[in-house]
């Protein structure tokens, strides 16, 4: 298994898919920058490329939460958890969700809630994309010069907006709340809510 790297926040995973009837080419890049932090807390890993034809390929990105202790360790541990269980059963993607739930519970028990990370995992199998995400790390699809956000940021502000729409308080309070930018979901909580594909996304030549 390929081990995750341990370098810088605001990293970007770029996956380019070129397909035709006879060929399937996959390019993966990991671009990172430490920003204004003193320590890199990202982790990134991919499954073995030589098993792409049979098992597909899995790319995992985790961003340790800089405001909490042990963010880097948790990010590396989460990437390793998914890669060590790859290849996943096909097409039972529900098993992957259960794996992530198990992973976050173990991390919660290990660190007692004093740390966490975001997660984006993309599994390309043939010409189809499955993904799972927790937190606010983004997954984008670039298709024919148009950029599409595939996942939803899980931030506390969205919960506040829903409550304001239900009449709990004025909508202005959802934007002024000091916790608005905090994560509502992250790996390291005892229980998490996933954003994921329920139906795989078909990929086309030139998709990135």
Predicted features and spans:
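PP2C/PPM-type serine/threonine phosphatase catalytic domain
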Residues: 1-208
């Amino acid at each position: 298994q390929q081990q995750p790297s341990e370098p810088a926040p605001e990293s970007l995973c770029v996956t380019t898919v070129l397909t035709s009837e006879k060929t399937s080419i996959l390019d993966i890049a990991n671009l990172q920058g430490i920003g204004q932090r003193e320590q890199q807390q990202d982790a990134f890993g991919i499954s073995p490329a030589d098993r792409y034809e049979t098992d597909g390929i899995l790319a995992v990105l985790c961003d340790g939460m800089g405001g909490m202790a042990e963010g880097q360790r948790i990010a590396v541990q989460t990437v390793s958890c998914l890669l060590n269980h790859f290849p996943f059963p096909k097409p039972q993607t529900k098993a992957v969700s259960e794996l992530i739930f198990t992973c976050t519970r173990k991390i919660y028990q290990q660190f007692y809630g004093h740390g966490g990370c975001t997660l984006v995992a993309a599994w390309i199998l043939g010409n189809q994309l499955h993904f799972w995400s927790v937190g606010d790390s983004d997954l984008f699809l670039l298709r024919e010069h148009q950029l599409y956000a595939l996942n939803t940021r899980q931030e506390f502000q969205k919960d506040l907006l829903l409550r304001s729409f239900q009449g709990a308080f004025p909508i202005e309070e959802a934007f002024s709340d000091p916790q608005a930018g905090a994560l509502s979901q992250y790996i390291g909580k005892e229980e998490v809510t996933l954003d994921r594909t329920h139906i795989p996304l078909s990929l086309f030549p030139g998709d990135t």
